């Protein structure tokens, strides 16, 4: 049986995601960064290799169980995402002069019959409203919906102003002002490809449910009496709609709505009514009454423009010193992940930030360890990868992955660092002896010299995963992710 999952279901999902931040049993989300070492071909303990792209061409993540497990191996830190960090969004479409924009229609994709039969499509070829280029972002950061493109003409006059009335520009386009991007929205939710979408309360309050403002000419007809014929009824399930039909050369050349009416979910204009209004002998005209979305244009910008995308923007400020300094600086990252309902120390994570690395407190050392070098421990055979070396506090931060030289030992096992056996850096030749004491140093509580990651491995869900070119972090730097 033919069926479809509608775009409203996609919008519903985005609404549910936003609501999940504030429900009584709210989900908890974190944005994590990871992969401090370069992408490349990795050797597995069974001597086979896995291709992981390169630093010049980051690998495309795979939606798989393996990818989710792998991602937890090298998380460096994570920061909680709040409801202020998210926004409904739509594809960004900048107004550009000389462009033919699509106009809003309620019936894209429907088979329209009459003098000709065809699937209703936009000038761009789109057969679905949300695929059509029917809204724009202007240089003033105002967003407008195109209601009429003047017969597929080039747009040459940028719309401006915030009036609730329909705006007709000098190029014949008709626009409806929807909302403006605030300074905060521009800072946090405006990218090259997407932009925030939100309903303007003033515009929403002024919207009229079921009004008709646009009528398009499908077939102009012939034989009619020239002139402007007023009082032509817009029939349908609404009331009071009326228009003026202009006939020139015997054919319909323009339709101007004079009374928008209310309550229309379908409508039509009969050729006979145009004849009765004075266009004697007109025949064959076919007019399309454009039905507005529920509530009217501007009533709900999120639904009207297709806001089934959600943007997330979280700031990482240096070490996040105000939040216990869990973020590493002087190191780079190549992976970003959105995590849901992870655990920390066996319980639901709740801290503003979480440290993703493991750490060893050294009692003594010789030389300085270097970032990204392999470290090995005598006797235990443990292997790891250095993320940060805090020489002042003698804390060695590291990760362990499931590959050779980064976590797997000579037997292919992931062995934990333990006891006071000497740790050696394979590039720097530095050595260190782990402390056997349990103490708190730099806000980190060590047990016999060791502490695990504050992100419990393989808990919760990875909802989003992105590999990217390396970004080097600095203490005076803020990343907007």
For each feature predicted by the language model, list its residue ranges.
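Tryptophan-rich substrate-binding surfaces of secreted polymer-degrading and adhesive proteins
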Residues: 1-207, 286-288, 296, 341-345, ...
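Conserved, function-critical positions that sit in or immediately flank catalytic
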Residues: 171-481
């Amino acid at each position: 049986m033919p069926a479809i999952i509608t775009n409203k279901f996609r919008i519903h999902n985005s609404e549910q995601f936003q609501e999940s931040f504030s429900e009584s049993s709210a989900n908890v989300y974190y944005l994590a960064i990871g992969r401090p070492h370069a992408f490349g071909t990795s050797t597995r303990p069974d001597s086979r290799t896995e291709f992981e792209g390169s630093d010049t061409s980051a690998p495309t993540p795979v939606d798989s169980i393996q990818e989710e497990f792998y991602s937890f191996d090298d998380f460096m830190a994570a920061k909680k995402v709040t409801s202020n960090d998210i926004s409904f969004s739509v594809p960004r479409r900048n107004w550009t002069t000389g462009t033919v924009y699509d106009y809003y229609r309620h019936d894209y994709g429907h088979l329209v019959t009459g003098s000709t039969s065809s699937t209703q499509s936009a000038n761009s070829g789109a057969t679905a409203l949300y695929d059509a280029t029917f809204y724009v972002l202007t240089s003033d950061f105002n967003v407008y919906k195109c209601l009429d493109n003047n017969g597929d003409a080039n747009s040459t006059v940028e719309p401006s102003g915030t009036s609730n009335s329909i705006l007709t520009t000098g190029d014949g386009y008709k626009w409806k002002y929807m909302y403006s991007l605030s300074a905060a929205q521009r800072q946090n939710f405006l990218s090259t490809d997407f932009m925030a979408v939100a309903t303007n309360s003033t515009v929403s309050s002024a919207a009229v449910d079921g009004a008709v403002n646009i009528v398009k000419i499908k077939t102009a007809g012939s034989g009619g009496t020239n002139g402007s014929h007023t009082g032509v009824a817009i029939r349908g399930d609404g009331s009071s709609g009326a228009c003026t039909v202009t006939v020139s050369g015997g054919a319909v050349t323009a339709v101007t709505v004079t009374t928008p009416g209310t309550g229309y979910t379908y409508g039509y204009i009969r050729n006979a009514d145009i004849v009765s209004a004075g266009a004697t002998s007109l025949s064959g005209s076919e007019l399309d009454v454009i039905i507005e979305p529920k509530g009217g244009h501007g009533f709900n910008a999120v639904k009207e423009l297709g806001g089934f995308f959600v943007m997330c923007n979280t700031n990482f400020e240096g070490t996040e010193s105000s939040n216990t300094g869990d973020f590493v600086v002087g190191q780079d990252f190549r992976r970003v992940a959105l995590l849901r309902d992870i655990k920390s120390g066996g319980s639901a994570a709740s801290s503003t930030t979480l440290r993703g690395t493991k750490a060893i407190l050294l009692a003594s050392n010789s030389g300085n360890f270097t970032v990204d070098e392999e470290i090995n421990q005598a006797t235990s055979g443990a292997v790891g990868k250095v993320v940060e070396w805090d020489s002042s506090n003698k804390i060695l931060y590291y990760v362990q992955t499931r590959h050779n030289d980064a976590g797997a030992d000579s037997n292919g096992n992931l062995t934990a660092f333990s006891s006071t056996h000497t740790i050696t850096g394979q590039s720097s030749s530095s050595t260190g002896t782990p402390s056997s004491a349990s103490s708190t140093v730099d806000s980190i509580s060590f047990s016999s010299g060791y502490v695990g990651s504050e992100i419990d491995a393989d808990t919760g869900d990875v909802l989003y995963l992105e590999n990217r070119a390396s970004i080097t972090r600095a203490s005076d730097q803020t990343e907007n992710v």
